[in-house]
Every structure is written in structure tokens, then in C-alpha cells.
Amino acid sequence: MPTTLDQLNAMDRVGFAAALGGIYENTPWVAERAFTARPFASVADLYAAMQAAAASAAADEQLALIRAHPELATKVARASALTAESRREQGSLGLDRLSDADYERFERLNAAYRQRFGFPFIVCVRRHTRDSILDRFERRLASSPDEERAAALAEIGLIARLRLVDAVDGPGKPKTDGRLSTHVLDTVSGRPAAGLRVELAEIGAGTEGLL
């Protein structure tokens, strides 16, 4: 059951950090530092305070935050050695139910990435499909260490925003989705076409499915 913003505003530092400690994977100091900005008028204000705490942390603290996140779709993940939040997120894309061949592909990428950068590949899986994650994985291996450190922190912020929206009830939640509009022109009449059914499909590496 979500915690309300009013409840969070009434908590002491220990309770506040305990309630929000999982928003930034096993890193409760982010919530502890955001605590000083209470009371929060909106969930968006709370998120901004937590992001500010992470962004202003020392370099070694940020690296520890990055390293607190699990690798994607490893045999360790298969054995359920994940936080509840990460398990749900990876499970939503079936990353805990891959074939042995797919697990081996992820493990090769995980090993190559960790060897190059010294920390796990991080992506907000709830904003991706399995194919887009693999594509992003391959492309980011070519980045510089500084670029990947910045990318990892940005993805952590996206993960935290979605987790916070799920975990806290209150006014002014940060935006977590967007809009897609489709315009079909009737070229004979020069007016928008009416009565057409539009279906969106994702086409990936050997897969295709309606969205």
C-alpha cells in the first residue's frame, strides 16, 4: 500500500529513510539527505529533493549508488537475488524468464560492460522493450567512462521517478508518460481522414508485436 505524502512529512528521519530507502536501490542516504527539505507540497517536490541529493553527492558516493544496482538478466537475477523493486521491473519484460541462449547474451554484455566501465549497465527497463535494451546495451559500450557515468545517473533518476510515483500517494506527481498523436490526411478531400483504425506495432530483432 502506498505511503501518503502527509505521512512522509510527519515522519522522523529514520522513518522517512526507511519508507523511501528502496527508491534509489539500496541507497537510503539519498532519502536521508532529502529529509531536510521537508515539508513537501507535492510528490514532484519530493522527487526533486531526492534528485538534488543524488546529484550533489561526492563522486565516490555516486559511484557506490551506481554499483548498488543489479546487472540485467543474470543467473544471479534468475535466483531472485534482487530487491523487490528490481525483481518487478526486470520481470515486467520477462528478463527473469529468458532462454539459456538469451541469458548467455546478456551475461556476455554485462561482463564486457563491467570490464570497460567498472560498474553495471543501468537502464530504466520500464521505458524499454527487450530489443531496445539490447540495442542500447550494444551502443553504450562505445561510450566514454564519463559519458556512461552520466548516463547511469540519468537512468537511475528515471527509475527512481517511476518507483516514487508508485510508492507515494499525494498531489503533484511528476510526469511519467507522454502522448502520441496520429494524423491521417484524406488527400482527395484535403481533410483529416475519419473512421480509420490505427494500430501501432513494435518490430525488433526477430520479433513483432502490437502495442
Q: Which role fits each region the language model picked out?
A:
Residues 5-10, 24, 29-109, 163:
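Aromatic-anchored, charged helix-turn/loop surface patch used as a conserved interaction hotspot
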Residues 16:
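Surface-exposed, charge/polar-rich loops and edge strands
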Residues 151-174:
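Charged phosphate-binding loop/patch that engages nucleotide di/tri-phosphates or the phosphate backbone
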Residues 166-194, 200-203:
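Beta-strand-rich domain onsets/edges
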